[in-house]
Structure formats: C-alpha cells, structure tokens
Amino acid sequence: VELTERGAIKVDNDYRSSVPSIFAVGDVTDRIQLTPVAIREGHAFADAQFGGSPRTIDYGCIPSAVFSHPPIGAVGLTESQAKNRLGMVRTYTSDFRAMKYVLAGRNERSLYKLVVDDATDEVVGIHMIGPDAPEILQAAAIAVRARLKKADFDATVAL
C-alpha cells in the first residue's frame, strides 16, 4: 500500500488505495482528521460500494474550530484564499452581542467576517471569534455549502 511522506495511506476519490482491494477512510488518510469527517467518509464509501449510490464529500465546506478563549470557528475560504482563487472579493465584518449576554447585562461580544465572491455574490467563507463560535459555525457551514448569496443573508430577519 502506497503511503504519503507523512505515513498516510494514499487513496483516490473512491477511497481506493494503490492496492485495488484495499480501501481507507478517516485518520489513516491524508484528508481532514476529524471524527465527523471519518464517519461521513465511511458512509460515502459504504453507500458507493454496497448501496449503489456513490456520493462525494465537499471538503471545502467542513467547519473547523479552535476551542480557545475566546473560541474561533471558520468554514470555507479565508479572505486570502478567496482572493487567490477568485480574484475580486468583498468582506463584511461585524460584531454582535448574543441575546443571552444582552439579557444578563454582560458585554461579551463576538466578531464575524463574511468573505463574498464579488462576481457572483456567493458567500465563500465565514469566520467568527467569540462565545459559542464553533457551534454557530456548524450552522453557517450550511450556508457556504448551499452557496447562499450575500443578498440571502441581508434578506434574513435576525432574532
């Protein structure tokens, strides 16, 4: 079985290794090493091999987090990655206070940044720092995966 320089099993898009009868998913490969990713890869492999419904995983829409204080969450492209890949981008930043902090009289704030493809208005990245950022970014990943437009965000009534 062929390995990468770091010792991971090399696989193709169907999770097949260099030996046709050996497949690999999860942390033994050189893809994103997160439990939910390994589970999704296992489902995709089983569906393709045994269920007759091949599916792919969009590795570009997997949220990531740093569980620090304050926590950080991100999904999609950074501003720099978007500029390199797409050319012109727009960014929008804002801070806000979660309702639980408003009601408690606390001044804890979060900062978020949207990265938008200038040509299509598509939100290609969302980044956040502040309380509950990782949990919030899990839901935001749906917006990036669904290729929502900045106009969709603007048209949404906030709580």
Model-derived regions: residue spans:
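FAD-site-proximal beta/loop scaffold in flavoenzymes
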Residues: 1-51
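Short, flexible active-site loops
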Residues: 25-31, 59-68
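Flexible, glycine-rich terminal cap/loop adjacent to redox cofactors
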Residues: 50-53, 62, 67-159
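Glycine-rich active-site loop/strand segments that organize a redox cofactor
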Residues: 55-57
